[in-house]
Amino acid sequence: MKEGIHPKYNEVTVKCACGNSFQTRSTRTEISTEICSACHPFFTGKQKLVDTAGRVERFRKKYGMQ
């Protein structure tokens, strides 16, 4: 690699909204996220259905499904 053209690659702490944090390496100085593997429903096994403003009901009504 050429000298002086690449950004610094530092160890950073990734902070999740759930309170979990872990170390990784990045060119950024800090990283925050809303969902991580500790709180994501796929990884925790706590799947939940999110029905935003009755979209499922509107779909069923529109296409005649009961």
From Swiss-Prot:
Function: Binds the 23S rRNA.
Protein name: Large ribosomal subunit protein bL31
Subunit structure: Part of the 50S ribosomal subunit.
Domain of life of the source: Bacteria
Needed co-factor(s): Zn(2+)
Residues forming coiled coils: none
Positions contributing to Zn(2+) binding: C16, C18, C36, C39
Keywords associated with the record: Metal-binding, Ribonucleoprotein, Ribosomal protein, RNA-binding, rRNA-binding, Zinc
BP term (GO), one: translation
Any one Gene Ontology cellular component term annotated for this protein: ribonucleoprotein complex
Similarity comment: Belongs to the bacterial ribosomal protein bL31 family. Type A subfamily.
GO molecular function: metal ion binding; rRNA binding; structural constituent of ribosome
InterPro entries: Ribosomal_bL28/bL31-like_sf, Ribosomal_bL31, Ribosomal_bL31_A, Ribosomal_bL31_sf
Cofactor: record remark: Binds 1 zinc ion per subunit.
